[in-house]
Design a protein with these regions (language model features):
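Ligand-binding clefts of soluble mixed alpha/beta catalytic domains
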Residues: 1-429
Length: 429
């Protein structure tokens, strides 16, 4: 029932090559989408520019790229890759909000295997160079991978169900079908007492947000729709519904790299936050992060520059922002991940939360290094110092008493708290 604008390339006609006339047709449709405030969906299946038209074909690409840029943040743009996309033609999908690739059928690359072989001597096949799996897990270009064209269209429809038609509207709200105060006692034991043990944050996300009946009464279906699932798995982002309303969900993933922030995770989070803010989607963030990934690879790769993108994204976001600290919230990572200090509206902490400049063990080793070297039983004394540090500086109750978090809540009551907070913030200006 949603209005959308669609442009499709037909590979059976001259390989779907991009001509001056095709450019005019696609640009006209995109202009209409912008003017009417409806999402734009591009079905890409083309060998690239129509060489025999010379520079006119390139001019057509330029006109399309310009319109993709003008539409950014105004209407949602989705690219569905159903075949090849090579050379300059990749920049139009690259400028859109979401890319859905079809496994085994679609390939994206700027320079093909033959050119790479000639210039660099490197042998690489199409799938390794620019296949769906490569772009979904390595480059991060693809947000979704479909098994075939039918699934690609199904993903497109599901994605559109979470998105507003334009930046002046709110996402479609569904009649609530789940109990807004539904408690889930299983969440109270989700986080292991040992901070070195991992858990899957998806288990919390799928239980907290709206569920609807599945094929089995004992197995409800979660409304959580993950985006970029294969890229930077140490962070989880996606859409969900909370009492019928669409929210953007961001979370560290302790089950992968302890949920640490690295370059790829920073880019993944920042881009998603900015998209949600642009299309009036409230943000809910779950924090369990020991910090930023150390090492020369990350430092030389620009972790400072990429990490700053998260600060910028959350700081400029004007939509309702709610944060839940589930366990570790250390140092700069705590600050950038929707903390109170960058104007998050509501911050909750589970009793397992540990909010501090750094982990208790590391802090004790620095603060009491000389004293530990002098005692006869350093392990016992260190354990005592660690316990004292956690209670005095890392306890969520200490953070709540100081106003750094708004409340310490039981994990089982998280859903009720989030529903109430979102209802309170609905008319946030």
């Amino acid at each position: 029932g949603r209005k959308v604008a669609v442009a499709a390339q037909d590979f059976t006609v001259i390989g779907g090559s991009f001509s001056e006339a095709q450019a005019q047709k696609v640009c006209k449709v995109l202009d209409m989408a912008i003017g009417s405030g409806v999402p734009f969906v591009a079905l890409n299946d083309s060998v690239g520019a129509r060489i025999q038209e010379g520079v006119w074909s390139l001019a057509g690409y330029s006109e399309l790229f310009w319109r993709n840029t003008q539409a950014s943040g105004v209407i949602p743009q989705i690219s569905v890759m159903l075949g090849p996309c090579a050379g300059g033609s990749v920049y139009s999908p690259g400028l859109t909000d979401f890319i859905i690739m079809t496994a085994g059928l679609s390939h994206m690359f700027i320079t093909g295997p033959q050119v790479i072989k000639t210039v660099t001597g490197e042998d690489v096949d199409l799938e390794t160079l620019g296949g769906a799996q490569t772009h979904a897990s390595v480059s991060g270009v693809a947000h979704f991978v479909a098994a075939d064209e039918d699934e690609a269209f199904s993903i497109t429809r599901k994605l559109l169900s979470y998105l507003s038609s334009n930046n002046a509207e709110s996402p479609p709200r569904l009649p609530p079908t789940d109990d807004p105060v539904r408690a889930d006692p299983a969440l109270d034991t989700l986080v292991p007492p040992d901070g070195s043990q991992s858990y899957d944050i998806r288990h919390a996300i799928t239980r907290i947000f709206d569920q609807h009946p599945g094929q089995s009464p004992t197995e409800p279906v979660s409304s959580f729709f993950e985006v970029h699932a294969r890229f930077a798995p140490n962070a989880v982002v996606g859409f969900a519904r909370l009492h019928g309303e669409v929210v953007g969900v961001i979370a560290n993933q302790p089950a992968h790299m302890a949920g640490v922030l690295d370059i790829n995770a920073s880019d993944k989070i920042a881009r998603f936050v900015r998209f949600c803010d642009g299309f009036n989607i409230p943000l809910v963030t779950f924090v369990d992060c020991p910090g930023f990934m150390p090492g020369t690879v990350q430092e030389h790769g620009g972790i400072i520059r990429h990490g700053a993108k998260i600060v910028y994204a959350y700081s400029e976001a004007t939509v309702p922002k709610i944060c839940v600290v589930t366990r570790k919230a250390y140092g700069g990572a705590y600050i950038v991940l929707s903390s109170k200090y960058i104007r998050t509206d509501m911050v909750y902490a589970w009793p397992t939360a540990e909010i501090a400049v750094m982990g208790a063990e590391g802090a004790v080793n620095i603060l009491y290094r000389k004293r530990l070297a002098e005692v006869e039983n350093p392990d016992q004394v260190q354990a005592q110092f660690v316990a004292e540090f956690r209670e005095q500086f890392g306890s969520p109750y200490a953070a709540a008493a100081s106003g750094h978090v708004d409340d310490v809540i039981l994990p089982s009551e998280t859903r009720a708290k989030l529903v109430a907070a979102l209802d309170f913030l609905r008319d946030k200006q």
